[in-house]
Amino acid sequence: MSLVYMNIMTAFTVSLVGLLMYRSHLMSSLLCLEGMMLSLFVMATLTILNSHFTLASMMPIILLVFAACEAALGLSLLVMVSNTYGTDYVQNLNLLQC
């Protein structure tokens, strides 16, 4: 494995550990999820470019679409929770009812 792949895997691992450790605030969780999605995007792009696998060249774009949808839903949930309760604690999400 080259140094670039090791750095990307380290970025993914740090984001995953951050997601597992700092779960109290919704904003911290969303930032860690974005870091994970960014490292997955870079890893998929580099893997496809290095292997010349042209059939899967759309996969990073699809991953970016899912990341954008996840970010939009997460931010809308963050705005709704912070307007309702005044804080962005994840424990307030258990109180939400449809």
Swiss-Prot record:
Domain of life per record: Eukaryota
InterPro entries in UniProt: NADH_UbQ_OxRdtase_chain4L/K, NUOK/Mnh_C1-like
Enzyme class: translocase
Keyword set, alphabetical order: Electron transport, Membrane, Mitochondrion, Mitochondrion inner membrane, NAD, Respiratory chain, Translocase, Transmembrane, Transmembrane helix, Transport, Ubiquinone
Single GO term (MF): NADH dehydrogenase (ubiquinone) activity
TM stretches of this protein: 1-21, 29-49, 61-81
Catalytic reaction equation(s): a ubiquinone + NADH + 5 H(+)(in) = a ubiquinol + NAD(+) + 4 H(+)(out)
Cellular location(s): Mitochondrion inner membrane
Enzyme Commission number(s) from the entry: 7.1.1.2
Function comment: Core subunit of the mitochondrial membrane respiratory chain NADH dehydrogenase (Complex I) which catalyzes electron transfer from NADH through the respiratory chain, using ubiquinone as an electron acceptor. Part of the enzyme membrane arm which is embedded in the lipid bilayer and involved in proton translocation.
Record-stated family: Belongs to the complex I subunit 4L family.
Name of this protein: NADH-ubiquinone oxidoreductase chain 4L
Primary gene name: MT-ND4L
